């Protein structure tokens, strides 16, 4: 009987102590239109910020019908 009572009290404590934390940790709602605009903005910025990168120095891997 004591084990069940301790278990029940512990369970209730954990449930009610976690509720405010869940509410605070919940991410704010962002409408799909806002996210789409941010994505377009990010895409435009990435077009502007292209960086020139040289070719790779890695060799070819041996493959079926490839360069040995």
Swiss-Prot record:
Motif extent (SxS motif essential for MIK2 binding): 56-58
Gene Ontology molecular function terms on file: LRR domain binding; receptor serine/threonine kinase binding
Keyword Transport appears in the UniProt entry: no
Motif (SCOOP motif): 50-64
Function: Brassicaceae-specific phytocytokine (plant endogenous peptide released into the apoplast) perceived by MIK2 in a BAK1/SERK3 and SERK4 coreceptors-dependent manner, that modulates various physiological and antimicrobial processes including growth prevention and reactive oxygen species (ROS) response regulation.
Family assignment from sequence similarity: Belongs to the serine rich endogenous peptide (SCOOP) phytocytokine family.
Protein name: Serine rich endogenous peptide 22
This protein's encoding gene: PROSCOOP22
């Amino acid at each position: 009987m004591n084990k069940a009572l301790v278990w029940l009290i512990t369970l209730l404590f954990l449930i009610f102590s976690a509720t405010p934390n869940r509410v605070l940790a919940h991410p704010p709602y962002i409408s799909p239109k806002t996210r789409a605009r941010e994505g377009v903005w990010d895409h435009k910025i990435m077009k502007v910020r292209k960086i020139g990168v040289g070719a790779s120095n890695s060799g070819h891997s041996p493959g079926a019908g490839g360069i040995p």
